[in-house]
């Protein structure tokens, strides 16, 4: 799926992906308005992850919260597999890393 991400979000997405992969995430996904195209002023960046080592979620979430220009909503798909399955079924999740 080709995403048309507005420039103001691109650097945060790349930085978040790199941080999450460096912290051990096996997979990083985008979902929400940046995937559906329903972007509004002030939209956040919805990121889903799989395979983050135990005990690291709140550490990386706080780093994303304080280090990024845009608000990041981080969801652990390992803990929310039904949510991931629903997004995947309707085609509103894209793996980015």
Summary of predicted features, one role per range:
Residues 48-50:
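Short hydrophobic/aromatic beta-strand micro-patches
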Residues 43-45:
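Periplasmic OmpA-like peptidoglycan-binding domain that tethers envelope proteins to the cell wall
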Residues 1-29, 35-41, 52-97:
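Catalytic core of pol beta-like nucleotidyltransferases
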């Amino acid at each position: 799926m080709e995403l048309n991400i507005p420039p103001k979000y691109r650097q945060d997405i790349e930085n978040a992906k790199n941080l999450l992969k460096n912290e051990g995430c096996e997979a990083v996904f985008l979902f929400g308005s940046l995937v559906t195209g329903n972007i509004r002023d002030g939209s956040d960046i919805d990121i889903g992850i799989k395979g983050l080592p135990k005990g690291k979620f709140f550490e990386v979430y706080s780093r994303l919260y304080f280090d990024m220009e845009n608000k990041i909503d981080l969801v652990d798909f390992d803990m929310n597999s039904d949510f991931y399955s629903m997004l995947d079924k309707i085609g509103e999740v894209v793996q980015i890393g």
